[in-house]
Design a protein with these regions (language model features):
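Mixed-charge (Asp/Glu-Lys/Arg
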Residues: 1-39, 44-175
Length: 175
């Protein structure tokens, strides 16, 4: 299991790589240390002609990103504390929030998956619902766990889709 320091380094490297990639594409990108807690973003990218977009970054060294489904879906336990009851999707934490999922590799071989927060939410909620429905909404090992994971293969259609961000912010430079 990764240490707290290793997780912080992974996150920091991911944020700086995303900021650098956005700058290469003509945006002015500013990473924050960690994220802006209330607003849930890690980077603000601004166009040279105005406008900006908030970006949340999630980086990994291995095969899957880890999430708490409650950030994406209202979930609570039934009266006996075993069955999960799935409610409505959570509101987007920041308007038009973009997400960049990063797989850290050797220098120059990193992978970037760019999607809207709502697209990420849809992927996670659909997979979580399908998983729980197989077990009548009672998690087999730890009924009260809200953990979910997203494999690289789940987001491959979003790889290198930088235009999803670039199209939201006016820029005078070509990508």
């Amino acid at each position: 299991m990764a240490t707290g320091q290793a997780n912080k380094l992974t996150g920091a490297v991911g944020e700086f790589l995303v900021a650098a990639e956005l700058c290469r594409r003509g945006l002015l990108a500013t990473p924050f240390a960690g994220n802006v807690p209330v607003l849930h973003y890690d980077i603000i990218a601004s166009g040279q002609s105005g406008g900006h977009v908030a970006v949340q970054v999630k980086a990994i060294n291995r095969h899957a990103w880890q999430f708490d489904i409650r950030k994406f879906l209202d979930v609570h336990m039934d009266e006996d504390g075993k069955r999960q009851i799935l409610g409505a999707p959570q509101q987007e934490p920041f308007p038009e929030l973009m997400c960049v999922l990063v797989v850290l590799k050797k220098t120059g071989q990193d992978r970037f998956f760019i999607l809207e927060w709502k697209q990420l939410q849809n992927l996670l909620v659909r997979a979580y619902t399908e998983y729980l429905s197989k077990y009548n909404f009672v998690r087999p090992r730890v009924p009260g766990s809200f953990h979910t994971a997203l494999a690289i293969s789940d987001v491959e259609p979003f790889e290198k889709k930088w235009a999803k961000i670039l199209d939201r912010v006016p820029s005078t430079l070509m990508a």
